Structure formats: structure tokens, C-alpha cells
């Protein structure tokens, strides 16, 4: 039997610190409240019935935090290529949902240091912040 006020199991220490900061600021939010559906194209896919080479696979994405104003916040330490591809697909399939990123630091997307996380967000139309605190302007 679980306790009603039991703290959720966070996926990282960063998520826990961000959520604790929101609680300390008395900001209402939900942690991983639901899943959003999205599709990704299957590489080298083939439909045996119609012969189409365009195949889609259904996936689900769980936002880290949803603020009471409807803003979805994805909290990231490391931001891999796989995650970047996934988030573009999530946004494409859910265009009316405001998804933003809170990065622990503005790291490099690639080993050759050609693009930072912030530059990737700007290029792909995502709002973002750097640090461990959700900006006040996202809440007001």
C-alpha cells in the first residue's frame, strides 16, 4: 500500500532538484502526468501490402513536468542525438503543445563542437533555459 504524499521516483538527481525548487517556490506542476503519442519513420521500411517505403511506428513520450499553465518542460543533463530526433517527432505530432527544455548546461550536440543545445533549440523552434531553475517567465 502506498502513501498518498509519497514523493515520486525521479529519473535523475537533476529532475529531483528542479521539482524541489518548484515546490519551494509554491508553483503548481505535475511530474510525468501522462504520455503523448507520436510517430517516427522506420528507416528502410517496406509495406508488403501496398509497396510503400514510408513506414511509421507509433511511440509515446512522457513529459517530465507539466506546469499548471500547460507548458511542458523536458529536463535534460545530456541531450543525445536520439533524444533530439525524438523531440522533433513529438513536436511534429503535437504542434499545439508548448514543449520547452531546461538544460543543466549548454553542452555540445556533437563531438566536433559545431552546435550547442541552445542553438539546436533555436533552429528547431523550441524555447529553452540553462540551469536548474525553471524561469519565472515560464510560470507567470
Residue ranges and their predicted role:
Residues 1-140:
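Nucleic-acid endo/exonuclease domains
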Amino acid at each position: 500500500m502506498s502513501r498518498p504524499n509519497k514523493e515520486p521516483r525521479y529519473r535523475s538527481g537533476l529532475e529531483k532538484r528542479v521539482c524541489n525548487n518548484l515546490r519551494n517556490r509554491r508553483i503548481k506542476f505535475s511530474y510525468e502526468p501522462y504520455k503523448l503519442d507520436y510517430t517516427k519513420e522506420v528507416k528502410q521500411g517496406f509495406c508488403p501490402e501496398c509497396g510503400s517505403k514510408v513506414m511509421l511506428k507509433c511511440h509515446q513520450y512522457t513529459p517530465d513536468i507539466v506546469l499548471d499553465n500547460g507548458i511542458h518542460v523536458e529536463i535534460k543533463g545530456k541531450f543525445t542525438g536520439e533524444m533530439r530526433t525524438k523531440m522533433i517527432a513529438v513536436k511534429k505530432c503535437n504542434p499545439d503543445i508548448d514543449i520547452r527544455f531546461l538544460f543543466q548546461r549548454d553542452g555540445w550536440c556533437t563531438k566536433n563542437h559545431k552546435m550547442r543545445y541552445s542553438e539546436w533549440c533555436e533552429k528547431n523552434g523550441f524555447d529553452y533555459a540553462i540551469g536548474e531553475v525553471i524561469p519565472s517567465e515560464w510560470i507567470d
